[in-house]
Amino acid sequence: MLVDSVGSVKYDEKLTEERLKYQVACYLATKDIIADRHLDFGAIKCMPDMTNFRAPQCISTALLNGGYDADGEFDPFPISCEADADGALTMEMLKLISGGMPTMFADVSHVGYKEKLIYLPNCGSMCTYYAGRCCDGCRNMKNIELRRANRPSGGAVTFTVPSAGEMTMARLCRVNGKYQMFIIETEFVDPSKEILDAFVKARGVHQLPVAFMKADFDIEKFVDRFNSNHISGVAGHYKKGTYQSVQSAGH
């Protein structure tokens, strides 16, 4: 059961057992749709339809991307939020280039110039694999807290801070109707207690999972050229392979 596999569940008036059961039902329904349609990757619209009137799909995207649930391990299914098809396509490319590794999806939210960090939260979901980067999915799940989703329909978000380690971050963007690929080899780092506490305090009741990306590059250049509010990633360094795949596709 989901509640037994995660580190904790913070029930309140927004996150009830009934709401959580509904989110799990949505996850199982999404798995059925994927199987019925033989999909390789996907994107869920979620906001505002599901978040306002049903339930946020944070459980679905976290588990599908992570490749682990109550039935055990399965092939990770790259899936993005907010109907971001190009984000999902980027995730699929990173999965294939990395040999099948789980991929993640996040918002480019905040730049910490002093700390040389870029904050990468998500509106409520984070691929479960990155909660621990362990081959044992059960151990990763123990690093996740289910906290209230501050959305009209309530439900849970998968709160975690992704583990430190090498990352390849990428994004397919359209510029003047043509694709461009942005690729960064970097790493996630463990934030100091002060940085994490400040982030949590700033979020108030609206808590989100967040990765902290080391910005050992020209931050201003990144801000000027990066052409999206979303970014995708995979564990390891695959800049060369990603570049070669884009070149072979003619972009």
Regions found by a protein language model. Give the residues of each.
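Anaerobic metallocofactor- and corrinoid-dependent redox/one-carbon enzyme cores
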Residues: L2-H251
